[in-house]
């Protein structure tokens, strides 16, 4: 399980150090792709297979299902950790997520998310204000 928030930097070649707490669970190779809210999602190879199977059940007769699958899968790339614990984030994904030098990497249960630090900060500030209301509306269990 992935959890926590970590600040890292992109170098001039588009490489970013993956938080050491995430490296063991991600293994040497994992998948990154376009996520929601202008961030990147990162999945283990095993979790990616689960998601792929779920996506296969989407009705191809629905235009939105086709659009979503195209965006999600066309942005997907397998990355590999180098000896320094870095991954190379392709230019198209850096552009999609508006990644600048300063990044925030967060753990969200079964995935990691890679955010531009400023975008994450804005999203967090906006979401923090309504956190309790969201919990009340969406979550149907006690902690």
Swiss-Prot record:
Keywords: Cytoplasm, DNA-binding, Repeat, Transcription, Transcription regulation. One of its GO terms (molecular function) is DNA-binding transcription factor activity. This is Transcriptional regulator MraZ. InterPro entries: MraZ (IPR003444), MraZ_C (IPR035644), MraZ_dom (IPR020603), MraZ_N (IPR035642), MraZ_sf (IPR038619), SpoVT-AbrB_dom (IPR007159), SpoVT-AbrB_sf (IPR037914). GO terms for cellular component: cytoplasm; nucleoid. It comes from Staphylococcus saprophyticus subsp. saprophyticus (strain ATCC 15305 / DSM 20229 / NCIMB 8711 / NCTC 7292 / S-41). It is found in: Cytoplasm, Nucleoid. Signal peptide: none annotated. One of its GO terms (biological process) is negative regulation of DNA-templated transcription initiation. Belongs to the MraZ family. Gene3D superfamilies: Transcriptional regulator MraZ domain. HAMAP family: MraZ (MF_01008). Forms oligomers. Residues 5-47, 76-119 form the SpoVT-AbrB domain.
